[in-house]
Amino acid sequence: VAKLKNDIARNFILGLESKLKTLPKSIPADKMQEIYNDHLFAPGLYCRQMRIPQGMCIVGKIHKHSHINVITKGEIKVVTEFDSDTYTAPKIWISEPGTKRAVYALTDTEWMTVHANPDNITDIDSLVDLLTVSNYDSLDLLIDKGELQ
């Protein structure tokens, strides 16, 4: 769990997120949800499919739980506090609890994340609350309590 507290990577990602919000063509997170995401549900599972146009840079939320990632199309640069890599479709991997990603689409990219959804929640705002935290202080509290999965 100590590796989760990588302050250099955290500060880079937060700084990028802050700068992106000031750009004239910046898309607010809530609007991006409407434009670029599809949501799929199966018993006990939630899948989010995101379409990311070439040249778009996105900083995501902090995920509380480990989850599956699938790049089905394209090539994308991904930076987290755990590592930095370029992924080319087809690519499948598992994200660690506590992951916050900054991504840059090198080509048009389609990305799916698959999350446990044991209560079969279908309300997207409720799922966001279940699966993510809004800041690193909240994440650190979960780490200290041993509540990351």
Feature-to-residue mapping (PLM):
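A short, N-terminal "cap"/entry segment at the start of jelly-roll beta-barrel domains
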Residues: 1-49, 81, 139-149
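Conserved short histidine dyad/triad with adjacent acidic residue
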Residues: 46-64
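Short histidine-centered beta-strand/loop micro-motifs
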Residues: 58-63, 80, 103-104
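Glycine- and acidic-residue-biased ligand/ion/polar-headgroup-sensing regions
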Residues: 63-82
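Structural motif
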Residues: 75, 100, 108-110
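Short acidic-glycine-tyrosine-enriched beta hairpin
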Residues: 80-101
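Double-stranded beta-helix
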Residues: 106-149
